[in-house]
Amino acid sequence: MPSPGTVCSLLLLGMLWLDLAMAGSSFLSPEHQRAQQRKESKKPPAKLQPRALGGWLRPEDGDQAEGAEDELEIQFNAPFDVGIKLSGVQYQQHSQALGKFLQDILWEEAKEAPADK
C-alpha cells in the first residue's frame, strides 16, 4: 500500500493537471474564439496618420468624379494637429497666405527643436 505522502502527492499532481487541462480547453474552445471576435468587432477601426508625414501638404481624395467641385484638404502634424478644407477657388485665392502661415509654423518648430534637447 502506498504511503500517505505518496497518495497526497498524486492527488495534488492530479488536481494541478486537471486545472491545467481545464484552462487549456477553455482557451482553445470555440466559445472563447467567438467571444474574442465579438470584442474585436466592437472596436471602431482606427484612422492612424504617421507623424513622419507632418508638414507635407497632401490632398485626401485625389480620385473625385469628373465635374465635381475641386476640394483640397490639407492636414499636418506639427506640435499639434491642423486640418483645413478649401475649394479650388479658395485655394487659388489664399494659397500664398496659407503657404506663409505653414512655413512660419514649421520654421518656429525647427528653431525650437534644438533648444529643447
From Swiss-Prot:
Q: Name one GO cellular component term.
A: axon
Protein family per UniProt: Belongs to the motilin family.
Has UniProt tagged this entry with the keyword DNA damage?
no
Propeptide residues? 52-75, 99-117
Tell me the keywords, alphabetical order: Amidation, Hormone, Lipoprotein, Secreted, Signal
Claim: Signal is one of the keywords in the record: yes
Question: Modified after translation how?
Answer: O-octanoylated by GOAT/MBOAT4. O-octanoylation is essential for ghrelin activity.
Q: Name one GO molecular function term.
A: growth hormone-releasing hormone activity
* Residue segments, region Disordered: 29-67
Q: Which residues carry this modification: Leucine amide?
A: 98
Q: Which residues form the signal peptide?
A: 1-23
Task: Please report the name of this protein according to its UniProt entry.
Answer: Appetite-regulating hormone
Highest taxon of source? Eukaryota
Q: Where is the lipid attached (O-decanoyl serine)?
A: 26
Which residues are covalently lipidated (O-hexanoyl serine)? Answer: 26
Species for this entry:
Papio hamadryas (Hamadryas baboon)
Compositional bias annotation for Basic and acidic residues: 31-43
Q: Which Pfam families match?
A: Motilin_assoc, Motilin_ghrelin
Query: Which residue numbers carry lipidation of type O-octanoyl serine?
Result: 26
